[in-house]
Amino acid sequence: MSSEVSARRDAKKLVRSPSGLRMVPEHRAFGSPFGLEEPQWVPDKECRRCMQCDAKFDFLTRKHHCRRCGKCFCDRCCSQKVPLRRMCFVDPVRQCAECALVSLKEAEFYDKQLKVLLSGATFLVTFGNSEKPETMTCRLSNNQRYLFLDGDSHYEIEIVHISTVQILTEGFPPGGGNARATGMFLQYTVPGTEGVTQLKLTVVEDVTVGRRQAVAWLVAMHKAAKLLYESRDQ
């Protein structure tokens, strides 16, 4: 990939919407696959009462729109200002209690797990029915649109074309607890070709530090898949 193309993919611009300032991709086609579109606000003329507590709007009880769902609420039911990274807002924005809770949970992904995905981890990678795995570093691209696999060869998988993400586990530790993560199974399509391509990532067991990083990467990728499916269903 040329540096010029890479820079074009990552270019961003600051825009002002009715909800606040947003840092969005210069080219819409290069937006994050985890992003959400701004909702259509419920028209003011249809907002006579708070959609949570049913308080009637008047001179003293003002209406506010939740920036995530677009519904209208009174100040008491829509007072929290919470980061909303999936819509690219620069500053925390007003959200109803239900949406604020969801956005706070997503903030953990952006603050912690996204960094893990961008840093990458090393796996034994098996393509399709091949019996010979290749040691490769897997990481998410800076614009969050591609999964890069680098070893003796280089592959780019477009995130939006991933259809299946499954963590592979084995056994249970002594004394109970969660099953041990050993890898991940992915299915994805390649534009211009028929059928589904399969990919298996296996954790390298002989390096403790590398294993911890690899398992953290698997967990982060599983969370990313959930956000991806939500964005598709919007």
Curated annotation (Swiss-Prot):
The keyword Nucleus does not apply. The FYVE-type zinc finger mediates interaction with PTK2/FAK1, and also interaction with PI(3)P and association with endosomes. One of its GO terms (cellular component) is endosome. Pfam families: FYVE, ZFYVE21_C. It is found in: Cell junction, Focal adhesion; Cytoplasmic vesicle; Endosome. A zinc finger (FYVE-type) spans 44-104. InterPro entries: FYVE-type_Zinc_Finger, ZFYVE21_C, ZFYVE21_C_sf, Znf_FYVE, Znf_FYVE-rel, Znf_FYVE_PHD, Znf_RING/FYVE/PHD. Plays a role in cell adhesion, and thereby in cell motility which requires repeated formation and disassembly of focal adhesions. Regulates microtubule-induced PTK2/FAK1 dephosphorylation, an event important for focal adhesion disassembly, as well as integrin beta-1/ITGB1 cell surface expression. The lineage of its organism: Eukaryota, Metazoa, Chordata, Craniata, Vertebrata. Residues 107-234 are annotated as: PH-like. Zn(2+) 2 binds at C66, C69, C96, C99. GO terms for molecular function: zinc ion binding. CDD domains: FYVE_ZF21. This is Zinc finger FYVE domain-containing protein 21. Interacts with PTK2/FAK1. Zn(2+) 1 binds at C50, C53, C74, C77. Keywords: Cell junction, Cytoplasmic vesicle, Endosome, Metal-binding, Zinc, Zinc-finger.
